Amino acid sequence: MDWKNTFQPLAHTQNESLPELMMTHVSDWSAITMIGDDKKSYLQGQVTCDVVTLPNDESTLGAHCDAKGKVWSIFRLFHHNGGYALMQPKSAIEVELVEIKKYAVFSKVDIEQTSDVVIGVMGASADQYIDSISESQGKVRVISGGTAVQVSDNRWALLVTQEATEALVSSSTAEKVSEALWQYHEILDAQPNLSKAEQNEHIPQALNLQAIGGISFSKGCYTGQETVARAKYRGMNKREMRIVSGTSSDVLSLENTIELERSVGENWRGAGRLLNVYQFADNQAIGLMVLPNNLDDDVQLRLTAQPEQIWNILPLPYSLDEE
């Protein structure tokens, strides 16, 4: 049996507990890898996070921007197979690969999309499982066939070869679930995922990167730095990413744009579109979207295509003040 067919949807409501150990194939994710003598200095001059100070056993979020500070890619950066991996939504990589390689001809660096697979491990027993397949400690660990990276409490992403994936999937007793549950946890943790549809639209602070360790304001120059610094020191950022929740009578899928409106007095005005969404078995749904940062937390939202469905803003799991 093909290992990819072992992952099944797990219908549940917000009030139901999830299995203690779940494994999924995050098929919508991949990674860009970077090797070569100049990999560190080259990447340091391209991205918002500090590459030079990144330890082998830790990861960091980061963004790659254009010269105007608009984001091409949001990624999780970590050491992988003697180089770096920038793990991110697969749909963003086609454009991002071209942009991140733009000046590589002048450096000793090889940049490509990996053929490795992203496997997600989550649940109360996730850390214990990772301990069982690794011999080291830390938030980034070398494992058979690749690397295990902690992305939040009790949640790990494994970037591993096809062969290693088959062995992991067949040997693990974890509940094999669809990647929708991985995205559910991404939403709960308010982790920004930038797909192809959202590229080149937002500055990093509109996606909360300053609050989750994705921007270094003390490193040297990088592409788009002026805009990012101006947003911080002159207060020019007017947007933020929030968790939103409501109901839908239709199936919600990011394959179709999901737009929301916000109430303005007795009228409604376009608010934006969902960056990520997860739908429960009882038609409740939760998602992430970029909104104006001057909205009251109790402002009402609604689905543009289903105006009778009212949505609300939920609290973030972190402060939006810079770390």
UniProtKB/Swiss-Prot annotation:
SUPFAM superfamilies associated with the record: Aminomethyltransferase beta-barrel domain, Folate-binding domain
Cytoplasm is among the record's keywords: yes
Keywords linked to the UniProt accession: Cytoplasm, Folate-binding, tRNA processing
InterPro entries: GcvT/YgfZ_C, tRNA-modifying_YgfZ, YgfZ/GcvT, YgfZ/GcvT_CS, YgfZ_barrel
Residue sites binding folate per the record: W29, W182
Matching HAMAP family: tRNA_modifying_YgfZ (MF_01175)
Purpose: Folate-binding protein involved in regulating the level of ATP-DnaA and in the modification of some tRNAs. It is probably a key factor in regulatory networks that act via tRNA modification, such as initiation of chromosomal replication.
NCBIfam families reported in the protein's UniProt record: PRK09559.1, ygfZ_signature
Protein name: tRNA-modifying protein YgfZ
